[in-house]
Curated annotation (Swiss-Prot):
It comes from the Bacteria. It comes from Streptococcus agalactiae serotype V (strain ATCC BAA-611 / 2603 V/R). Gene3D superfamilies: Metal-dependent hydrolases (3.20.20.140), uronate isomerase, domain 2, chain A (1.10.2020.10). Belongs to the metallo-dependent hydrolases superfamily. Uronate isomerase family. This is Uronate isomerase. The gene is uxaC. NCBIfam families: PRK02925.1. It holds the Pfam family UxaC. Keywords: Isomerase.
C-alpha cells in the first residue's frame, strides 16, 4: 500500500466517504503555545530549521533517542547539520507520530512528496529554503492557508496583551487570536511564586498581604483578560488534589512562603485546592472555559533542564493515587458553591481515560443547554498519537457522548502543526467508519458525516461562545 496518499490513515471505504465531509472544514485551534508577537510581526521565514525544528521538543526527544549529539539538536551546529541529523533520525522513526506529522507537513505545506532521508536531506533542505523565500512563507500565510479561524494562545496573567490588541485592531487579518489565562505561578510550589506576588501587586496597585487580597488581585487580571477577548483559562497540574483548609491556615501559609518557607506536600495540596476553586468561581463569573492539563512529570533530566530550561523533551507521563476520589470531590464542591465553569480535562496517562471520562459524566447537568458541559479533552502530548486518540475516543464514546466532543487542538509552538488537525480527522473518520463497516451503527452517512464535521470544527465553535 502506498504511503501518505489521499487515503492516508483512512482504513476503509466508509472512512474515505466520511473524510469527504470533514477535509475542507476550517480549524478552530482553541489551545496552542504560539507567540502572538510572531503572528503580528509576520516575518518571512528564511530557514526551514527555524520553522520546523526550532523549539520542537517532540523532534528533539526523538533525535536524542537516535544518538544525535546535543550540538546538532539545540547547540551550535549549523542549520544544515541539524537538518541532516533530523533526517537521519526520521528515516528510523517508523511508528512514531513525528514520522507521520513530518511527512504530512513536507507534502501538504511544501509539496515535497519524497521520503526525507539522510541521503536526500541536503537537496531537500535547499529546496525548502527556496520555497520559503519564493512563496514568502510567514506565520499569517501558514495560518490562512490552513483555514484557521480561531487561535487560543497561552498567556501569563501579567501579560499586557499588547500583541493581542494589535492583532484585534488589524482588519487585514481575519483570524481571531484570543489570549488564554494561564496562572501557573499562582501556586506556592512554583519557583517564581514570590516574585509573581510582588509583580501582581505592582501591576494591580494592590497590597497583597493574605489569601483574600491575592484572589482580589487575580480577579483584576482575569477581568483585564476578559476585556481583551479572553475566552479560556488553562492550568497544568502534576496531580489532581483535594484537601480543604480554612482561610486562617491559608493566610499563614501565604506569609510563610513569601518569607522563604518551603511548603510540604499537604500544604501544596491545600493551596492548590483553595486557589483553583476560587479561580473556577471567577472563571464561571467571567465566562472562561477552564482547561485542566494534568499528569505530566516534568523536567526529569535535571542536567538538561538546568542547561536548556523547561519544555525541551525530558518530561514523562505520571501516575497518582486517588485520582477519581479527588476529581469527584473537587467537582462536587464546585457544584455546591455554584462555581463550576465549563471545563476541558486533558489526561496525559491513557491508563486513566475510562476513569476520567466516567467521572466527568457525573457532573454534566446544567440548565444552559450546553452539550457535554465538562469535556474530556483530546489525547494530549504523549497521547497525541493514533493509539492515544483512539483510546480517548473509546473512553468518551463508552462513558459519555462522543458526538459532543470538541475535537483536536495543536497545543503546539509550531506554525506547521495544523497538519495535526488533518491527522486527527483522518483517524476520527476511520474510527467512525469501522463502526459502519462492522455494523455497530446504522449505515447513515448523513448522520455520521454530520457528527464528524461537528467534532472536527463546529462543536468547538459552539462550546467557546461566551
Amino acid at each position: 500500500m502506498a504511503f501518505n496518499t489521499e487515503t492516508f490513515m483512512l482504513k476503509n471505504q466508509a472512512a474515505i466517504q466520511l473524510y469527504e465531509e470533514v477535509k475542507r472544514q476550517p480549524i478552530f485551534d482553541y489551545h496552542c503555545h504560539l507567540d502572538p508577537k510572531d503572528i503580528f510581526e509576520d516575518h518571512i521565514f528564511d530557514n526551514i530549521v527555524d520553522l520546523w525544528l526550532g523549539g520542537d521538543h517532540y523532534k528533539w526527544r526523538l533525535m536524542r533517542a537516535n544518538g544525535i549529539s546535543e550540538a546538532e539538536i539545540t547547540g551550535p551546529a549549523s542549520n544544515l547539520e541539524k537538518f541532516k541529523a533530523f533526517a537521519r533520525t526520521l528515516e528510523r522513526a517508523y511508528g512514531n507520530p513525528v514520522y507521520h506529522w513530518s511527512a504530512m507537513e513536507l507534502k501538504n505545506v511544501f509539496g515535497v512528496n519524497e521520503i526525507l532521508t539522510e541521503s536526500n536531506a541536503e537537496e531537500i533542505y535547499h529546496r525548502l529554503n527556496h520555497f520559503l523565500k519564493e512563496h514568502k512563507i510567514s506565520p499569517r500565510r501558514l495560518i490562512a492557508d490552513s483555514k484557521v479561524m480561531f487561535i487560543g494562545t497561552t498567556d501569563h496573567p501579567l501579560d499586557t496583551l499588547e500583541w493581542h490588541k494589535k492583532l484585534a485592531a488589524d482588519e487585514s487579518f481575519k483570524t481571531v487570536v484570543a489570549p488564554t489565562f494561564r496562572p501557573d505561578e499562582a501556586f506556592i510550589e512554583h519557583r517564581h511564586f514570590v516574585d509573581f506576588i510582588t509583580k501582581l501587586g505592582d501591576i494591580t496597585q494592590k497590597e497583597i498581604t493574605d489569601f483574600s487580597t491575592f484572589i482580589a488581585a487575580m480577579e483584576e487580571r482575569i477581568a483585564y483578560f476578559a476585556q481583551n477577548g479572553c475566552r479560556a483559562s488553562d492550568i497544568s497540574f502534576t496531580e489532581i488534589v483535594f484537601e480543604q483548609t480554612d482561610e486562617l491556615e491559608l493566610n499563614d501559609l501565604f506569609n510563610k512562603v513569601c518569607e522563604g518557607y518551603i511548603p510540604n506536600q499537604s500544604e501544596i495540596s491545600k493551596w492548590q485546592t483553595a486557589v483553583f476553586m476560587e479561580l473556577c468561581r471567577l472563571y464561571k463569573k467571567y465566562g472562561f472555559v477552564t482547561q485542566v492539563h494534568f499528569g505530566a512529570l516534568r523536567n526529569n533530566h535535571s542536567t538538561i533542564f538546568e542547561k536548556l530550561g523547561a519544555d525541551v523533551g525530558v518530561d514523562s507521563l505520571g501516575d497518582q493515587v486517588a485520582l477519581t476520589v479527588n476529581m469527584n470531590r473537587l467537582l462536587d464542591s464546585l457544584v455546591k458553591k455554584d462555581s463550576l465553569p465549563k471545563m476541558i480535562w486533558y489526561n496525559l496517562n491513557p491508563a486513566y481515560n475510562i476513569a476520567v471520562a466516567n467521572t466527568l459524566a457525573n457532573f454534566q447537568a446544567n440548565e444552559l443547554g450546553v452539550r457535554s458541559y465538562l469535556q474530556f479533552g483530546a489525547g494530549w502530548w504523549f497521547a497525541d498519537t493514533k493509539l492515544g486518540m483512539i483510546s480517548q475516543m473509546n473512553a468518551l464514546a463508552e462513558q459519555g457522548m462522543l458526538a459532543n466532543f470538541i475535537g483536536m487542538l495543536t497545543d503546539s509552538r509550531s506554525f506547521l502543526s495544523y497538519q495535526r488537525h488533518d491527522y486527527f480527522r483522518r483517524i476520527l473518520c476511520t474510527y467512525l467508519g469501522e463502526w459502519i463497516e462492522e455494523g455497530e451503527v446504522p449505515e447513515d452517512y448523513q448522520a455520521l458525516g454530520s457528527m464528524a464535521k461537528d467534532i472536527a470544527y463546529q462543536n468547538a465553535v459552539n462550546y467557546f461562545k461566551n
